[in-house]
Amino acid sequence: MAEVSVKQLATDIDTPVDRLLQQFVDAGISKSKADDLVSESEKQTLLAHLKKQHGGDELTAPARMTLQRKTKSTISVQGTGGKNKEVQVEVRKTRTYVKRSALEDEQRQAEAEETARLEAEEKARSEAENKVRLDAEEKARREAEQARREAEEKARIEAQSKARQAPQPAKAASSTAQQEAEKMAKREAEELKRQQEQTALQKAEELAAKKAEEARLMAEQNGPRWAEEEAARAKESSDYHLTTNKHAQAAEDELDRKEETSRRTAAAAVKAPKKAGRREDDRDSRNPRARKGKRGKMAMPNAMKHGFNKPAAVVNRDVVIGETITVAELANKMAVKGVEVIKAMMKMGAMATINQVIDQETAQLVAEEMGHKVVLRRENELEEAVLSDRDETSEAKSRAPVVTIMGHVDHGKTSLLDYIRKAKVAAGEAGGITQHIGAYHVETDSGMITFLDTPGHAAFTSMRARGAKSTDIVVLVVAADDGVMPQTIEAIQHAKAAEVPIVVAVNKIDKPEADPDRVKTELARYNVMSEDWGGDSQFVHVSAKSGEGIDDLLEAILIQSEVLELKAVVDGMASGVVIESFLDKGRGPVATVLVQEGTLRQGDIVLCGLEYGRIRAMRDELGREIKEAGPSLPVEILGLSGVPSAGDEATVVRDEKKAREVALYRQGKFRDVKLARQQKAKLENMFANMTEGEVSEVNVVIKADVQGSVQAICDALVQLSTDEVKVKIVGSGVGGITETDATLAAASSAILVGFNVRADASARKVIESESLDLRYYSVIYDLIDEVKQAMSGKLAPEYRQEIIGLAEVRSVFKSPKFGAVAGCMVTEGVVKRSNRIRVLRDNVVIYEGELESLRRFKDDVNEVRNGYECGIAVKNYNDVREGDQIEVYETIEIQRTL
């Protein structure tokens, strides 16, 4: 694993750097600076040291505690003249509490000493017995061995004597005699060994009996003393309160107060036998807070009890864990402190802070490690229940195809659609290029077709992907005179990814330079094969200008839709997809929805991504009010709680309350995911964070007219970032530029960019007072180019050295003021006094510095041109020789561009 700096580790575990350095020193690890690197083994060493320190260095409570209590009360005594007066009485009590552990430690120590003594005696006795037994066995073995050898020797001598007496014995008789002698010797040896073992055993038993008698005598002598010590310890234990917790103190104090109260009540009853006084005393005894002293203060209650009882054991809980949870929330569910959870995670090898978001699996392991039962909960149960409660009993019927027109920029997509719709849409787009998704439906003789017109510019990749995702057929427009271009290839990839059939419209066929065969050949490289060549893609030659081939294109689209057998449920609750969304100043959030199933009606409750609402009004693409819309129809809906993101699914639900709950849940989940992405406390991106401070940033606040344009601009600007300059989107949104946007731009030193929107009056005041850079755009080309220029201004300039003169040393002479002075001839360019120089010897630079003096005919001059002689003194350098060259150069700053 990569090493981490002390500073980064301190940030990860949320502790000061100085404290972490001190902990390293305490653990025996040499770390003195915040930039020092910490390896994995050093982290484990520190963790082990902290565990040991926290586990062993517990604060020792005092073994004995003395409490003093003062109780103040007033009694009424009879004074002179028959009047009663109040006298204050103060009762002081002193209690001494002894910690249970202290007495128990003494008792355990005494028991341990007694046990050790008895064990030592038993061990000594057993060792003595074993030693005696082993000595006896060894002695018996040696004696038996000696006896065996003697018997064998005796038998051998007898056999030899018998052999001598019988000079010619038989061989068998000799062998038999020898065997008999060996058997006799063996029996004698065994008998001797048995006798010796019996003798040793008797001696060991006598020694053991002697040791036992000594132990009995010692116990009889010390028994009374040991009994007295045990009785003294028991008496001492019974004289003290062994518990020092608050419950025992409260119970004892309550008993003392009852005795004191009863004593005062009896004294008052004797001296004041009036009925009213008795009633007053009874009331006081029933309600101790009712009686007040002279100063009107409440008297202390008799019993100071509270309802909380400290649990005697750990309570095992059922911990409900969602998909993501923070460490603090997990600790709260388990009713423990966050520090305990962090400790448990550190023991398991995971470092986390109290606000860090952890996943469900990690939280489950931590909770089970701490002894709790885990209940895993799916966060989207309510969402699934709401979305599943739908009317889906109707039969599916044929529907109109949804056709997306895609292709490279300026290949004539919108112009082709204009001719079909008999309207001029392209002229209304800024710069003549499409920057929004346009959704239109067209009634033809053969049926209805819904068209989605997507932008062709490179910045609108997400828009094209969104269009391909919600379409049935893709019409790929390729200019016959231009061929396949980058966005054409991208459109093919989107269509292939969405598994949507492609109909190729070869546009601009009326131009003289049109070459449709080249288009077929180029598209074949990307697996778009014509039906003429055995493929499955229809190729139609059209001209958006003259209208040639338009009917053939519509017929090809309808044929393709018949092959696909497109069907959808017409009746029932509608569902669709958001094609585009924007914020209208007078109407509020407006979303363009393409209905895919069911019928969308005015008054329906719609759940749309992170937003919800009841449809207040519906309009078609021409702005006409409509009451309902069926499948494959694009409509604008009003009444949502906010501007949904383009591409979100729009679904009609039954209950507005549940729709609101689901929307709020989605917003919270989106926030959690966003926070989880922003977690920087990871070792993997440590080096990226370290170099982040060296990168210049261009902050931008973007406001656009529709949500799709905001996404496209953000993606395009982020892609401009380089290693030296980074584009940071501080804020973005849909609608006009407000005072909040201007304040955000002022706080972050950002450029305000308005795309087809303008700033209101309050925002203009802030912009003028703060001198902010506000720029309006209607074409995305201009926006990207100007942001590039702003990024170029943030680039560090490049410096280049340019040689302006060269002088050759002809002679060297000494000067008392300058040292070695070179007499030179300027051979190239100009030698200037203010510029830096290099001294070259054999075309190798040996010194780099500056001129101290430049003279011509004993006069100081600022420059000497080519072909003239001069005297040059180099500052702080005297090793100038004949034949050296002095090169004069200047540094030029060159502004870099992206």
Swiss-Prot record:
MF annotations from Gene Ontology: GTP binding; GTPase activity; guanosine tetraphosphate binding; translation initiation factor activity
Which parts of the sequence are annotated with region: G2?
A: 432-436
Ranges where the record places region G3? 453-456
Q: Give the UniProt subcellular location, in the record's own words.
A: Cytoplasm
Chain residues that bind GTP: 407-414, 453-457, 507-510
For this UniProt record, the keywords arranged alphabetically read as follows: Cytoplasm, GTP-binding, Initiation factor, Nucleotide-binding, Protein biosynthesis
Query: Region G5: what ranges?
Result: 543-545
**Predominant location category:** cytoplasm
Q: Which residues form the signal peptide?
A: none
The segment annotated G4 runs over: 507-510
By its UniProt entry, which InterPro entries does this protein fall under?
A: DNA-bd_dom_put_sf, EF-G-like_DII, EFTu-like_2, IF2_assoc_dom_bac, IF2_II, IF2_N, P-loop_NTPase, Small_GTP-bd
State the family named in the UniProt similarity comment for this chain.
Answer: Belongs to the TRAFAC class translation factor GTPase superfamily. Classic translation factor GTPase family. IF-2 subfamily.
Name of the protein = Translation initiation factor IF-2
**Organism per entry:** Aeromonas salmonicida (strain A449)
